[in-house]
Amino acid sequence: MKAWREDYSNHRVRAVIEEYIHSTRDRALILDSLVDGLSYDELAERYSLTYEGVKDVMKKGRAALDRHY
C-alpha cells in the first residue's frame, strides 16, 4: 500500500470515498477523519466503536484511495 499522501485534495478524497465505500457509517467515519481531522479516539466515541474498529475502517478507506485516487 502506498504511504498516505498529505497532498490529496479534500474534494478528490471525498469523491473517491463516496464512490468506493458503500457503508454509510464507514463513509462518514472516513470523511470525518481525513477531511475534518477527527482523531481515532474521537471517531471511536462518535461511532460507538473501539479504537481497533476505527483503525479497520480507516484501513479500508486508505486502501480505496490508494487504488482509485
Predicted regions and their residues:
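Helix-turn-helix DNA-binding helix
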Residues: 54-55
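Short alpha-helical "recognition helix" segments of helix-turn-helix
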Residues: 42-47
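Conserved tyrosine-mediated DNA breakage-rejoining catalytic core shared by Y-recombinases
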Residues: 58-59
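Short amphipathic alpha helix immediately N-terminal
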Residues: 22-38
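C-terminal flanking helix
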Residues: 62-69
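Charged, low-cysteine interdomain linkers and short loop/connector segments
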Residues: 1-3
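Short, Lys/Arg-enriched anionic-surface-contact patches
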Residues: 5-25
